[in-house]
Amino acid sequence: ALAAARLEQLLEEFNITRLREAPAMALSGGERRRCEIARALAAHPSIMLLDEPFAGIDPISIADIRALVVQLRDRDIGVLITDHNVRETLDIVDRACIIYDGRVLFEGTPEALVADETVRRVYLGEGFAL
């Protein structure tokens, strides 16, 4: 009974009730991401890993996923994001890491990352702006 109630709560919260019976292959990228996050939350995690959450989804879904990440953070759920989409990620994180050539090149605040000359030279590009 508790699991069924939790399922209903998550389906409503993530606006995916209509997808309950849909096969995974029929879902859009954004719908798939919302289902993945809701499924992970069913286990009441203290931390979540989101691997490339902004890859292959439309701008509206990107905004939705960004809002979900902020909601997770507001629930005191740690969120670790691995993604190449720096613009979509930097303004919703407290800390960022750049891994380059198999090693941590930089770790710090998003502001410090964008200002770092080495990061700009080897990863972001000199003309990068948020």
Language-model features, listed with the residues they occupy:
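Conserved catalytic motifs of ABC-family nucleotide-binding domains
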Residues: 44
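Helical segment within the ABC ATPase nucleotide-binding domain
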Residues: 63-75
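Conserved ABC ATPase signature
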Residues: 23-27, 31
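Hydrophobic anchor residue at the start of the ABC signature
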Residues: 37
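Conserved ABC ATPase "signature" region
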Residues: 1-19, 70
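Catalytic Walker B motif of ABC-type/P-loop ATPase nucleotide-binding domains
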Residues: 48-52
